[in-house]
Amino acid sequence: MKLVVDASAIAALYVPEERSEQAERAVSQAQELHTLDLAAYEVANDLWKHARRGLLREDEASNMLEELWEFFKALKVHSYAEVLKDAFALALKHGVTVYDAAYVALAEKIGGKLLTLDRQLAEKFPALVTP
């Protein structure tokens, strides 16, 4: 299965949360992993927030960023430019952010499923989201 992994799912692989195991399981079962280039910035920003709030030490966040970089090497990383127009249309139609809609547009484009831990996004696109 082709799987598009959004920033929320990638972040859960590094910063444990209640649905981290779900993300790990889906990633391990996928035949192809895809994401958008913007995911690196989104996840790095999430690590930064955790460090700023004292939930992670700065060295922990930096180490996680290095691990994230290695993980991205195993992904097929797509440019936002590939899906921007479709993402914008989906965002307007479904009332989600263009950021979130971009992952949906990528899943549609490659004929894959979307792994997201964003419940609102999953509810808006249940046919595309992997459980």
Swiss-Prot record:
Its cofactor is Mg(2+). The keyword Ligase does not apply. It is an enzyme of class 3 (hydrolase). Residues 4-121 form the PINc domain. The keyword Transferase does not apply. One of its GO terms (molecular function) is RNA nuclease activity. InterPro entries: PIN-like_dom_sf, PIN_dom, PIN_Pae0151-like, TypeII_TA_RNase_PINc/VapC, VapC_family. Keywords: Hydrolase, Magnesium, Metal-binding, Nuclease, Toxin-antitoxin system. Inhibited by EDTA. Mg(2+) binds at D6, D100, D118. Its EC number is 3.1.-.-. It holds the Pfam family PIN. It comes from the Archaea. PANTHER family: EXONUCLEASE VAPC9 (PTHR35901:SF1), RIBONUCLEASE VAPC3 (PTHR35901). Homodimer. Forms a complex with putative antitoxin VapB3, possibly VapB(2)-VapC(2). Toxic component of a type II toxin-antitoxin (TA) system. Has ribonuclease activity. Belongs to the PINc/VapC protein family. This is Ribonuclease VapC3. It comes from Pyrobaculum aerophilum (strain ATCC 51768 / DSM 7523 / JCM 9630 / CIP 104966 / NBRC 100827 / IM2). The lineage of its organism: Archaea, Thermoproteota, Thermoprotei, Thermoproteales, Thermoproteaceae.
